[in-house]
Design a protein with these regions (language model features):
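Ferredoxin-type iron-sulfur electron-transfer modules and their immediate structural context
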Residues: 1-115
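Beta1-alpha1 glycine-rich phosphate/pyrophosphate-binding loop at the start
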Residues: 1, 30-42, 51-53, 80, ...
């Protein structure tokens, strides 16, 4: 179940802000986990979302689907005591809060660098399309299926990743 605002802040305040954060080492994309958690702990949800957006276009997906117990949470120093920071739940909270409140919208630069076609609208296709759009490319995504989403839509069960995302 998703965290409430109060639960998310309390959970974020448990972070020890390690000098050598294992959570970043355990994250395949090296998210700045301590910084986004610190901002969340202070109630700066928009800033936390901005930090996440620096590395991922899909925090709502990553917060639900990534194997946190093997990655960021598995490398959390508090894991030694059996209770690591619930990083995935915090990422999910920030992404959902942003979607509900419509807080952050990145400024997309003018499309001056040419046209790019992306084949497939799964997580990789959506990520590269978003990154290229932020670099000023005009991006067209092609998808063979009736609905975009790839494995996000067709390969992950509804209870794990709601289709509305």
């Amino acid at each position: 179940t998703p965290l409430t605002m109060e639960e998310a802040i309390v959970e974020a305040k448990r972070c020890l802000n390690c000098k050598k954060p294992g959570c970043i080492t355990g994250c395949p994309i090296s998210n700045d986990i301590p910084d986004f958690i610190h901002q969340l702990s202070r109630g700066n949800f928009g800033e936390a979302r901005t930090i996440l957006a620096g590395k991922t276009n899909l925090p709502a997906v990553c917060g639900r689907v990534c194997p946190h117990e093997k990655q960021c949470e598995g490398h959390c120093v508090l894991n030694r005591a059996g209770k690591p920071i619930r990083i995935g739940k915090l990422e999910q909270f920030i992404a959902d809060f942003d979607a509900d409140m419509n807080l952050i919208r990145e400024k997309i630069p003018p499309k001056t660098r040419g046209n790019v076609a992306v084949i497939g609208s799964g997580p990789a296709g959506l990520t590269v399309a978003g990154d290229l759009a932020m670099m000023g490319f005009n991006v067209t995504v092609y998808e063979a299926e009736d609905e975009p989403g790839g494995v996000l839509l067709y390969g992950i069960p509804e209870f794990r990743l709601p289709k509305r995302l």
